[in-house]
């Protein structure tokens, strides 16, 4: 951190991940004319950022996600969707991706929606089913590198852009609501055959 700025983690879990809090002369004093919102994020001189992170052995801070995006599985394990999305976004056909949970047989299972560029299929001379097979293999490799509770079980393919803010960030809640309102589609797949 900068001189005279303190950064700590609040409410750390067993993996050392907690909410990033900061205080110092250059940290915000509050929201203008919004005392309730200010009281939610400023406590005892600390600014609660809403970001989650962890420190490594050298004191470097790593941001792992947003507190409001955490998925709490039925077994109590926390999943930070941004961690998995970062891996999926490296795939050459993943223009956009979103990880979310849906209820299935009294449990939560992870899904991802992947938006692929429309011309990707033309460039590869593939059908959507051929892309789905590639996605299934790639998600299998991603799953193999993660604990079982973080495994993606299902995926959705689309070439339609997701709902975004003016700064081009995916609006998670409206996009998930849109997905949940849709009936199963031929473009919804299981990760295993």
Each language-model region and where it sits:
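Conserved C-terminal "lid"/linker of ANL adenylate-forming enzymes
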Residues: 98, 140-193
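Ser/Thr-glycine-rich phosphate-binding loops at phosphate-binding pockets of nucleotides
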Residues: 49, 74, 165-167
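AMP-binding/adenylate-forming catalytic core of the ANL superfamily
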Residues: 11, 24, 29-30, 52-146
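Short coil-to-beta-strand transition motifs
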Residues: 1-4, 47
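Glycine-centered tight turns that cap/initiate beta-strands
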Residues: 4, 93-96, 151
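Short secondary-structure edge/capping micro-motifs at helix/strand boundaries
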Residues: 37-38
């Amino acid at each position: 951190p900068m001189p005279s700025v303190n950064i700590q983690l609040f409410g750390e879990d067993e993996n050392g991940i907690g909410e990033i809090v900061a205080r110092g002369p250059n940290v915000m004093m509050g929201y203008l004319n919004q005392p309730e919102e200010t009281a939610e994020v400023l406590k005892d001189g600390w600014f609660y950022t809403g970001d989650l992170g962890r420190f490594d052995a050298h004191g470097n801070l790593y941001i792992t996600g947003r507190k409001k995006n955490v998925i709490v599985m039925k077994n109590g394990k926390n999943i930070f969707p941004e961690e998995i999305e970062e891996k999926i976004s490296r795939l050459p056909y993943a223009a956009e991706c979103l990880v979310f949970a849906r209820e299935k047989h009294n449990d939560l299972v992870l899904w991802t929606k992947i938006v692929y560029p429309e011309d990707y299929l033309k460039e590869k001379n593939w059908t959507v089913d051929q892309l789905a097979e590639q996605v299934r293999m790639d998600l299998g490799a991603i799953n193999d590198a993660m604990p079982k509770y973080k495994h993606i079980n299902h995926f959705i393919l689309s070439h339609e852009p997701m709902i975004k803010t003016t700064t081009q960030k995916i609006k998670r809640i409206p996009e998930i609501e849109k997905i949940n309102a849709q009936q199963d589609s031929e473009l919804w797949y299981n990760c295993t055959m």
